[in-house]
Every structure is written in structure tokens, then in C-alpha cells.
A protein has these predicted regions:
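Mature N-terminal segment immediately following signal peptide/propeptide cleavage
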Residues: 17-59, 74-77, 512
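N-terminal, intrinsically disordered, basic low-complexity segments enriched in Arg/Pro/Ser/Thr
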Residues: 13-16, 164
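Repeat-blade elements of multi-bladed beta-propeller folds
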Residues: 22-26, 67-88, 115-149, 182-208, ...
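N-terminal leader/propeptide and maturation segments of large enzyme subunits in energy/redox metabolism
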Residues: 375-400
Length: 627
């Protein structure tokens, strides 16, 4: 491995991970998604075949929740076992060489309840350095559940660790002013620093001004005792009505050597109207660095002021070395990348506040400026009528007329009563799939979406009539009541015509590689970009996608994520797709790779995504080279 690669991984706190391991969600605590394995490379990747397949049976018995279930998990390899979670928070331990089940734990999620999200992105592992070898619960697997529990399991047996909380679990709803029981959840694996388990929460959007608070909590990994809390919007306590959320629902990163945890936060409630939460709304829409031991704020960097567009920081912060400084990269739904000094939060490149259009909605006061960055955006950030697209001229003209009817003055155009074009849409840009960092080629690699959305504010007194009309016309957008605000909202993707195709030029999804070094003229550039998958047969390439990439020292980028059911490999230097394999279902997850007994495997959870409308299933598929 090159010296730079070693330097980056050590800085990210991954020294304890062997080359063949994948012991954390992003492989290392810094979320680089970089593996030093080289057995599978550009010369032999076409010889990959299915080594084993495991079926979780998570969708049994059939329930209405299956319609929104999403198998988004990335397995981890820890102390010789492969651990993963299902959309219903079952935790499974597998033999990494054969896929044979070692144990399975079921938390008995109530499948007749209504949950905002039905997913789990994975589990976290911890070995107690004070416990004797072979002791019960010396190795622990932690999962946060969609019914808001934090559970600790014995890594060897899958049985709950009785000394943690109450019989192995903590009820995370205690002390929370719940508005709706199924809208306060945990969907991402917790972060572990020393003997602390640190977790955020997933809070259902667009329901009301007064929502649950997005407080981050740290618990003792042995006992479950609460050690500290951190409130992302402490100023909201003094407001009437009190805004909520600003929750950290994505995956955190940690620099264990510096004792720091990096937390991505979402928008304050409600997402699309801020008249009840004046100001810049710090520390919503930010990456914050906390002292892991105490929860004390070290610094904060806000990427969107007074968010009106649902531009949460969804991606896991990526730890890397930049200009010979320990850094953290913030990858956003807007397609912007910010690289900050890990110790101070100061940008390590040029950023600036740019003037933005004002709101024309009574009661709203949009923030007058938003940040721009030296790095080239990963996705388009504006669209006009001339950019309308359709398979036929009639479809293109229909899309053009729709765009002409909207308020569309660039990325940060505030929501309006007539309808505003959101470019990019609220799914990104880059979502929770995050980025992979290749230290050998100085690349930041991410999956991106290029589908604008339309959002329209609805005066409260007109909401019932609008909902009735939408039912009559079979409209498939989403209403958000935003109770407590003078306006509800309606949003929908910018798709039209008889085939419900995007009104934007393809590709509608792409994988991109951002060069972390400037070109000869000092400019930022994309080293390459390539369409990712297909939305449907017969359409141009480039699919909506949810999930992320990984990168290996073998010169390969692996990703699934697209709506079609394939795992793909790309050449890290050129972006050329050089291999793909069909999966039993779509892979709306991030793959991982590891080596056992001298053989490298690439594993993906292929279970589809109910909300995306992709092919559903319950498979975990491992690929390896033939004998």
C-alpha cells in the first residue's frame, strides 16, 4: 500500500482494522469505504462469480409495512463473523466464507404499527477491553431499531446482554415528547468511541412545527447508563411554538485519536416553511464536532442556512488528509463538497456566501445568502424551460410548460404558493450512500441523483380541498400538513407524460469521481463521471439510486444502488464499467469487501426499496473469484 494510503487510514482511526476486515459501517471510523485488498483487481474482476447467497426471510410474514421496507444494510466483518441487520431490525451472524447462519436475533418489531421508515443500515461492534477472553458479552453487537430501542447483543451467541439497560435494551423514547410513536426511530448504526455508544434519531418529516427534538445521546457500552446528551437547536427551547428535529439520522464518524465524533444534522421542523423558526437555525444542516467523552461542542459548520428545501446532511462525514492537514469532507444533497480542518472546522479551500432570492410567501424570511465552494458541484444545480426533456416532442413540450409555470431561480429558490423547482431535489445530490475516499488516486467517489422536485405551499384553509382533488386525479405526490404553520406543503418529483419519466436530461443518476487536487490551472474538476444503472429497460442510462460506493486498492469501485438489480464494478482511474452481475433484487445498499482464508469476497444486501419501487427481496449475496 502506498504511504499516503496508510497515512489517511491511520488518521481516520482505522489502525485496529486488519487489511481483510470491515469492522465498521464505512470500514473504518472515518467512513472512507476504502479497502487495501488487491486480490480482485481490474484484470480479473470479470471472473467474479456468486460464492454464496443467504436469504433473511425478513419479509415474512407479509405485512403492509413490506411496501415501504428497504434493505439498506452494509454488513460488517468483526472477529471472524459477518453481522448484518434487516429492515425489521433482525440481527444475523453469518460464516463469512460460506454464508451459513451462526445465529439470528429478532427484536419482535410490531408489524401492525405504522412507522415512518422501515429500514436499518447496519450494526456496530465493540470488544470490551476489560472483559476476559470468552466472557459473556465481551464482544457486543449494537443496533438501533425502528421502534426506538438501543439493543446490545453477545457477538458469539446473539443473546441480549442483560447488564445493558433493561435486559439488553434501552427505550430511547424515554424523556422524548413524542408526537407520533412511529415517527421517532433509529435507522443508522450507532458510533462507538472508547466505551461509549453514540446515537442519533430518525424523525418523520413535514408533520408539524413542534416535533420531537433531535438530541444526540451517548450511553455506557457496558451498562447502558446515559453519559451525555447534545441538543442541535438549544435556541428552540425559548420559541413558541417550539421547532423540533434537526436530528442526526445518518451515520456519524469518529477520530478516536483526537477524541472527536463528527455528526451530520438535518433540517429543523417543518422542512419547507421557516416562518416559525427565524434565523439561520444553527446547528441544523451542519456537521458538528463534539468531544466524544463529554458531548461538548468543539466546532460546527453549517452548509445550509435556514433550510427550506429538506437539504439534510445525509452523508457520513469522510475523514481524510487534505493539504497535509487532518480533514473531514462534508458531502451534501446539493452536490457541494466542503473539506474542513478536522480540529477547527475551518474550510481548507475557498468558500463564500452568495446572495440568494428572497421568499415571496407572507410570513417567510429566507436567509439572504448561502455558501458556495471551490470544489466543482457533483450535480447540476439549476434548470430552466430550455432544459426540458422527453422521449417525444409532445412530452418535452409538456415538461417545458410545467417548468415555465414554476418559480425557478436556481438551487436555493424558496418554496412558493405557485410551486418552486428544487434542483437538486431533496433526495440529492448525494444522500446517505455517502462517498468513498481513494487515497492512492486522491479521489472522492459518490453516487448522485439528478432528479429535480417541485414543492408548493398550500394555505391551511385550502388543504382539505387540495387533498380531495389529488385523490380524484390520482396524483402521486406527497402532502405534508406542517401543523402549526400557516401552510401545508405538496411535493412531487419532476416527472411527467404517460410514462412518468423525468423532465430532465439523462442520466438521472451517475457515479462521479471528484479530484481532490486542483488541475494545472488551479481549478477543481471531476476526474470522471458515468451513468449508473437503468431506470427501466429501453430508457437512456442513469437511474435514481440509493446506496453508496466502495473503493479498493485493486483499482475498483463497487456499487449497486440503482433501480435495476445489478452490482457493478468501475475502473477507478477512468470510470469505465468493467463488470456487472445480476442480483435477486435491487441493491439499495452499500457493498463491502473482506478476506478470509486467503480469499477476497464482495458482499451486497439485495432486498430492494419499497419507496423507490425497485424489485424487492431478502438476499445477501457474496462474490469471489473462481478456483
Amino acid at each position: 500500500m502506498h504511504f499516503l494510503a496508510i497515512l489517511v487510514l491511520l488518521a481516520a482511526g482505522a489502525a485496529q482494522a486488519g487489511d481483510g476486515d470491515w469492522p465498521a459501517y464505512g470500514r473504518d471510523p472515518g467512513g472512507t469505504r476504502y479497502s487495501p485488498l488487491t486480490q480482485i483487481d481490474r484484470g480479473n474482476v470479470t471472473k467474479l462469480h456468486v460464492a454464496w447467497t443467504y436469504h433473511t426471510h425478513a419479509l415474512e410474514p407479509q405485512s403492509q409495512l413490506n411496501e415501504k421496507a428497504a434493505f439498506e444494510a452494509t454488513p460488517i466483518l468483526f472477529e471472524g463473523s459477518l453481522y448484518l441487520s434487516t429492515p425489521f431490525d433482525q440481527v444475523i451472524a453469518l460464516d463469512p466464507a460460506t454464508g451459513a447462519e451462526k445465529w439470528k436475533y429478532d427484536p419482535d418489531i410490531n408489524r401492525s404499527a405504522n412507522y415512518s421508515e422501515v429500514t436499518s443500515r447496519g450494526v456496530s461492534a465493540w470488544a470490551d477491553p476489560k472483559a476476559a477472553e470468552g466472557a459473556v458479552c465481551r464482544s457486543r453487537i449494537f443496533i438501533g431499531t425502528i421502534d426506538a430501542r438501543l439493543i446490545a447483543l453477545d457477538g458469539r451467541t446473539g443473546k441480549p446482554c442483560d447488564g445493558f439497560g433493561e435486559h439488553g435494551a434501552i427505550d430511547l423514547t424515554r424523556g422524548v415528547e413524542l408526537r407520533n410513536r412511529g415517527d421517532y426511530q433509529v435507522t443508522s448504526p450507532p458510533t462507538i468511541v472508547d466505551d461509549l455508544v453514540i446515537t442519533g434519531s430518525s424523525i418523520g418529516d413535514n408533520r408539524a412545527v413542534e416535533l420531537e427534538r433531535g438530541i444526540v445521546r451517548a450511553f455506557d457500552a457496558r451498562t447502558g447508563k446515559l453519559r451525555w446528551t447534545w441538543d442541535p437547536i438549544p435556541w428552540a427551547e425559548k420559541q413558541k411554538p417550539r421547532t423540533g428535529a434537526a436530528n442526526a439520522w445518518g451515520v456519524f464518524s469518529a477520530d478516536r485519536a483526537r477524541g472527536l465524533v463528527f455528526i451530520p444534522t438535518g433540517s429543523a421542523s417543518p422542512d419547507f416553511y421557516g416562518g416559525e423558526r427565524p434565523g439561520d437555525n444553527a446547528y441544523a444542516n451542519s456537521v458538528v464536532a463534539l468531544q466524544a467523552a463529554t458531548g461538548k461542542l468543539v466546532w460546527a459548520f453549517q452548509v445550509v442556512h435556514h433550510d427550506l428545501w429538506d437539504y439534510d446532511v445525509a452523508a457520513q462525514p469522510s475523514l481524510l488528509t487534505f493539504h497535509e492537514r487532518p480533514a473531514v469532507a462534508v458531502i451534501t444533497k446539493m452536490g457541494y463538497v466542503f473539506v474542513l480542518d478536522r480540529e477547527t472546522g475551518k474550510p481548507l479551500h475557498e468558500v463564500g456566501e452568495l446572495p440568494m432570492p428572497p421568499s415571496d410567501v407572507p410570513g417567510e424570511k429566507a436567509w439572504p445568502t448561502q455558501l458556495g465552494t471551490w470544489f466543482r458541484p457533483l450535480v447540476p444545480q439549476k434548470m430552466g424551460p430550455a432544459d426540458a426533456w422527453g422521449l417525444t416532442e409532445e412530452e418535452r413540450l409538456q415538461c417545458r410548460a410545467w417548468i415555465e409555470s414554476l418559480r425557478a431561480e436556481g438551487m436555493y429558490t424558496p418554496p412558493s404558493l405557485r410551486g418552486t423547482l428544487l434542483v437538486p431535489g431533496n433526495i440529492g445530490g448525494v444522500n446517505w450512500g455517502s462517498a468513498a475516499i481513494d487515497p492512492e488516486h486522491n479521489l472522492l467517489i459518490a453516487n448522485t441523483n439528478r432528479l429535480p422536485f417541485v414543492v408548493r405551499l398550500i394555505p391551511r384553509e385550502k388543504l382539505s380541498g387540495e387533498i380531495d382533488e389529488a385523490k380524484r386525479n390520482r396524483l402521486e405526490g406527497e402532502f405534508g400538513r406542517q401543523t402549526g404553520a400557516p401552510y401545508a406543503m405538496y411535493r412531487q418529483p419532476l416527472i411527467g407524460g404517460p410514462r412518468d419519466l423525468p423532465c430532465t436530461n439523462p442520466p438521472w443518476g451517475a457515479i462521479v469521481a471528484l479530484d481532490l487536487k486542483p488541475d494545472r490551472k488551479g481549478r477543481s474538476r471531476l476526474r470522471w463521471e458515468a451513468p449508473l444503472g437503468f431506470l427501466a429497460p429501453g430508457l437512456p442510462p442513469g437511474s435514481l439510486n440509493l446506496g453508496g460506493p466502495i473503493v479498493t486498492a485493486g483499482g475498483l469501485v463497487f456499487t449497486a444502488a440503482a433501480k435495476d438489480p445489478f452490482l457493478r464494478a468501475f475502473d477507478v482511474e477512468t470510470g469505465r464499467e468493467i463488470w456487472k452481475a445480476e442480483l435477486p433484487a435491487s441493491g439499495q445498499a452499500t457493498p463491502m469487501t473482506y478476506a478470509v482464508a486467503g480469499k477476497q469476497y464482495v458482499v451486497i444486501c439485495a432486498g430492494g426499496h419499497g419507496k423507490l419501487g425497485s424489485k424487492m427481496g431478502d438476499a445477501v449475496v457474496a462474490f469471489a473469484l473462481g478456483e
